[in-house]
Amino acid sequence: QAELGYEDALLDQAEPFSQWVIGDSTLAEKLPLNSSKFHVEFTDHIQAFKEQKVRILNGAHTSMVLGAYLSGLDYVGQCMEDPIIRKSLDQTVFGEIVPTVDLPEEKAVAFAQAVYERFENPFVKHALLAISLNSISKWRARVLPTFKDSLAATGKLPKLLTYSLAALLAFYRSSEAGDQCLIGTRTGNTYEIH
């Protein structure tokens, strides 16, 4: 309010992150957006950027949240502060996911570092149970392609992505059926499985 000089009832807090990728490199001269304060990239290979987002941002979430939740954590920020979960995430993202992204390694690493900044944002309380919704289809879309590419490249199962599959199975092990969902148990407390 002090900065604007008036009260904006619709003003909301947002993450300080932006990435614009435009899928036509010939537009770079016509749209001088690189001179703006926002990061804008023009490319003829838009699919690689979509894959980077799905594999690194969404894949990191999907591969981390179920094991972290079952270990007693509730929010992404807690995961980033927990030394064991953080080390596991580092090894997953930089050791198993980034090598499968079809972009120069420095671009994928920079994107992953920006994702980490978002995960560490103390103003965003991103609940692990919210991220867990529809985890089977999310794992299939966000993690399985990386899993397969890693296996094809190395001839070995990617250890931490394999662990994320085991966590998925453990999370979906229900103790009872609810009205519209299954009910799981974590350290004596129940949670809804959607």
Locations of the language-model features?
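Substrate/ligand-engaging "lid" and interaction regions
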Residues: Q1-H194
